[in-house]
């Protein structure tokens, strides 16, 4: 019976990741093989998309198990190079149950053009999708970090600011990282953030 419960738990995790990948692909947030998705199971195991898979066509076999340090449990599997950014979040907050990373047009362009170290989002009703926000009459900052192929080094830059992040964070010329207590919450936060970034991009284009 215990093994059946374990298998069911893993199957649910795979299903959530596959469905979220399809949703992100439909929205154009994970072009080609970009992006990665993960979730933490009730027993503490971490499921994440394997490296190189198209997120719009994921199957259960495209989801692999990793240790809390980001090492594939099965040595034959290859995890994304950015796996460390997922495990960093899980280690930072035990309440985090899912992490999503996408590469949308709006996130990419805005992150490359913003001169400061954060994008400020203010006055939007959709800000209320984020925990603790009860009004549109507020502003939240989305931290920006320079892209770095050395993921361990990038993680050390991100780490000091994690506790203050309300929206997620954005890597310049790359994409966003968002998370939530479960996959539904993480996906809602991602959709809310991508909507806000699309609005900001449209406003800039209107001014041009």
Curated annotation (Swiss-Prot):
Keywords: Amino-acid biosynthesis, Lyase, Metal-binding, Methionine biosynthesis, Zinc. GO terms for biological process: L-methionine salvage from methylthioadenosine; pentose catabolic process. The keyword Protease does not apply. Its cofactor is Zn(2+). InterPro entries: Aldolase_class_II_sugar_metab, Aldolase_II/adducin_N, Aldolase_II/adducin_N_sf, MethylthioRu-1-P_deHdtase_MtnB. SUPFAM superfamilies: AraD/HMP-PK domain-like. One of its GO terms (cellular component) is cytosol. GO terms for molecular function: aldehyde-lyase activity; methylthioribulose 1-phosphate dehydratase activity; zinc ion binding. Catalyzes the dehydration of methylthioribulose-1-phosphate (MTRu-1-P) into 2,3-diketo-5-methylthiopentyl-1-phosphate (DK-MTP-1-P). Belongs to the aldolase class II family. MtnB subfamily. This is Methylthioribulose-1-phosphate dehydratase. The lineage of its organism: Bacteria, Pseudomonadati, Pseudomonadota, Alphaproteobacteria, Acetobacterales.
């Amino acid at each position: 019976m215990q093994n059946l419960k374990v298998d069911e738990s893993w199957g649910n995790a795979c299903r959530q990741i596959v469905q979220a990948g399809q949703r992100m692909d439909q929205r154009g947030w994970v072009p080609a093989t970009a992006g990665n998705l993960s979730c933490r199971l009730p027993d503490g195991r971490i499921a994440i998309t394997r490296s190189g898979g198209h997120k719009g066509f994921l199957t259960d076999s495209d989801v692999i198990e990793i240790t809390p340090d980001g090492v594939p449990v099965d040595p034959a599997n290859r995890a994304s190079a950015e796996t460390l950014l997922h495990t960093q979040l899980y280690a930072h907050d035990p309440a985090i149950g899912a992490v999503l990373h996408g590469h949308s047009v709006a996130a990419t362009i805005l992150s490359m053009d913003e001169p400061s170290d954060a994008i400020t989002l203010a006055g939007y009703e959709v800000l209320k999708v984020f925990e603790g926000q009860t009004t549109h009459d507020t502003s939240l900052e989305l931290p920006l970090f320079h892209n770095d192929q050395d993921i361990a080094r990038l993680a050390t830059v991100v780490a000091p600011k994690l506790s203050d992040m309300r929206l997620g964070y954005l890597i310049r010329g790359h994409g966003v990282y968002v998370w939530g207590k479960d996959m539904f919450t993480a996906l809602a936060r991602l959709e809310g953030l991508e909507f806000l970034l699309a609005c900001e991009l449209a406003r800039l284009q209107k001014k041009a």
